Amino acid sequence: PGTKGFVSMIAEDGTFVKAEPIFKDIKVVDMIETANRLLAFVEGYEVRHAVIEDVHALYGSSAKGTFTFGYNSCVPEFFCAIAGLPYTKIPPKKWQSDMHKGIKMVTKNDGTKTVKDVKKMSIVAAHRIFPDVSLKRTNRSLKDDDNFADSLLMAEYGRRHFK
């Protein structure tokens, strides 16, 4: 979830089907337009199970930022509930510990200490599992998108655990 979040679909055999950003315009979240886009995304497919990241507000975030984050993070869950799709909410550490297995730890300096760079690790893991999928947000993007990578990895996590 989040304004830059993605929705991804993979087949039962693990092949990539499609993916796209949840919100068309991250500056203006239009719920009707988003719901219609998500309905079009699943139309014609038998969705067996959806996995939604169970996220929480970050300590130190502003009230406005926390409210916006909470509002946007509920969109996938509301969509699944309204569309009648089975879903499970999974904490990031749970799916990451499974999907990052075998990936050498990547670190970054957060200003005070060295911490694990889970965004880069997700990109590496997604490239290993889906080597033919470009993780670029758009055709014009220069860098891989960690939101796209996370979405793919959560779809794969769901495929492995919720058959």
Go through each PLM region and give its residues.
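Phosphate- and other anionic-substrate recognition elements at nucleic-acid/protein interfaces
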Residues: 1-163
